[in-house]
Amino acid sequence: MTTEPAPPAPPGVSRRHVLRGLGAATGVAAVAATGLLSYRAYDAAVLDPGGGDAHAPWRDWRAVPGPLGAVGAAVLAASPHNTQPWRFAVADDAIDVLADPTRGTGSVDPFSRERDVGLGCALENLVLACPPRGLSPTVTLLPGGDPVARVALTPGPAVTHPLYDVIDRRHTDRGPFRATPLAPATLEALSGADPAVHWVVDTAARAALGRLLVDAAEALVADTEQSVDNFAWFRATHDDEERHRDGLVLDGQGFGPLQLGAAKLLPPSSRAEGDRFWVDRTRDVHVATAAAYGVVTTPADTDDRAAHLEAGRLLQRVHLRATSLGIALHPMNQITERLDREATTGTASDLGPRLAALLPAGTRPLLVFRVGVPVRPARPTPRRPVAAVVA
């Protein structure tokens, strides 16, 4: 849920020069001059963002009845780097949620905390999607192994929770936000007044957290192993999206139409270019336009899978509430990714103490996100179909 890819650039040309100096429209014109624009536009799906089979799960899930329909909602949940680290064992009377050990991010998530948060997000969507199908869900967390959770199903009245109606409108928004402050009552509504969500709104605290996020991004890309593990989930082309149906894609980066078109038409970028662009984007767009930050915390003495699963369920609810209110949300986990990396390498920096100074005493940070009023709607990103995730 952290690193975003860079818009590609021609060999020897900086993407910052292409998309900022020349402008996106100029970038498109430059490619058009080669005589290949029509084919490249078709091949890169420039004219049909969000189309193709990789996006079909967003369109098809509501019409599917029973437990498989609920799984169809689950696969639309948020996950780290869009890894979709889930599998499901489906029966008429229960759905088991399982972790897929092949879909991790390595050194970026060495303790699998982010993976478990993603599983919690899927679990929340699954639970929301059962009642409209006449199924009453009862959740039992099984944090000691696999499955990680079981949802028992019994017949019940067909009722719809308001959050169910926005499941297919919820998308991570990495674009700019408007300079519109969010009222305290709005933030409380987003979190459901859950004390596990700590809001960072004060100007000084928000600036301090913004600097932390930029510093953590710089540290992450300077760590070769983390940089490589991040970039492994970048799907550089439309063909990559259709083949993998997961990962970080250009449609999910919050670009305007012309900028997105230019990015898709230009050749794929290198890892080093992508790293540099992400740091720049973090500083110049994400931090610069955040109206507020939320930090999902656990008690300082609690760091287990059950807590991570519940945090994922909470994050999914916050994001769905935000969607229902026209508010954008963007997870930014580079600080905790660096803290976990330091724990595995035996190193230390000032990131931990600086973040702790912004949080209530006795809490442990699990994930950070920014919120704000979006400049433009976020686009859907690829999803694997239900058939690919049912064990």
Q: Across the structure, where does each feature detected by a protein language model lie?
A:
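Acidic, surface-exposed loops and disordered segments
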Residues: 2-391
